[in-house]
Amino acid sequence: MEQAPEDHGPQREPYHEWTLELLEELKNEAVRHFPRPWLHSLGQYIYSTYGDTWEGVEAIIRILQQLLFIHFRIGCHHSRIGIIPQRRGRNGASRS
């Protein structure tokens, strides 16, 4: 029977350490784009729902990623990423 080869590669960074670093990066980015009271309320919601658990950390990471993605996608004023509305003439004509 075939077996997967043993992992002899370089040691990876521990998952929890990587997760906390990712959360810190997301929080720093979120503070630049969203009002602090919103983020504070989100943190309170996550804490009341999950308590002080890794499941809560994963949930807030997922939510912050989704919020930032949508924020950039619909057009953040701080970024070049996103949809930029095109100005058009009457009846969609783009040339004069």
Swiss-Prot record:
The keyword Transcription applies. The keyword Metal-binding does not apply. HIV-1 lineages are divided in three main groups, M (for Major), O (for Outlier), and N (for New, or Non-M, Non-O). The vast majority of strains found worldwide belong to the group M. Group O seems to be endemic to and largely confined to Cameroon and neighboring countries in West Central Africa, where these viruses represent a small minority of HIV-1 strains. The group N is represented by a limited number of isolates from Cameroonian persons. The group M is further subdivided in 9 clades or subtypes (A to D, F to H, J and K). GO terms for cellular component: host cell; host cell nucleus; host extracellular space; virion component. It holds the Pfam family VPR. It is found in: Virion; Host nucleus; Host extracellular space. It comes from the Viruses. It comes from Human immunodeficiency virus type 1 group M subtype J (isolate SE9280). Phosphorylated on several residues by host. These phosphorylations regulate VPR activity for the nuclear import of the HIV-1 pre-integration complex. During virus replication, may deplete host UNG protein, and incude G2-M cell cycle arrest. Acts by targeting specific host proteins for degradation by the 26S proteasome, through association with the cellular CUL4A-DDB1 E3 ligase complex by direct interaction with host VPRPB/DCAF-1. Cell cycle arrest reportedly occurs within hours of infection and is not blocked by antiviral agents, suggesting that it is initiated by the VPR carried into the virion. Additionally, VPR induces apoptosis in a cell cycle dependent manner suggesting that these two effects are mechanistically linked. Residues 1-42 are annotated as: Homooligomerization. InterPro entries: RetroV_VpR/X. Keywords: Activator, AIDS, Apoptosis, Cell cycle, Host G2/M cell cycle arrest by virus, Host nucleus, Host-virus interaction, Ion channel, Ion transport, Modulation of host cell cycle by virus, Phosphoprotein, Transcription, Transcription regulation, Transport, Viral penetration into host nucleus, Virion, Virus entry into host cell. The modification Phosphoserine is found at residues 79, 94, 96. Belongs to the HIV-1 VPR protein family. HAMAP family: HIV_VPR. This is Protein Vpr. The lineage of its organism: Viruses, Riboviria, Pararnavirae, Artverviricota, Revtraviricetes. Coiled coil: none annotated. Homooligomer, may form homodimer. Interacts with p6-gag region of the Pr55 Gag precursor protein through a (Leu-X-X)4 motif near the C-terminus of the P6gag protein. Interacts with host UNG. May interact with host RAD23A/HHR23A. Interacts with host VPRBP/DCAF1, leading to hijack the CUL4A-RBX1-DDB1-DCAF1/VPRBP complex, mediating ubiquitination of host proteins such as TERT and ZGPAT and arrest of the cell cycle in G2 phase. One of its GO terms (biological process) is DNA-templated transcription.
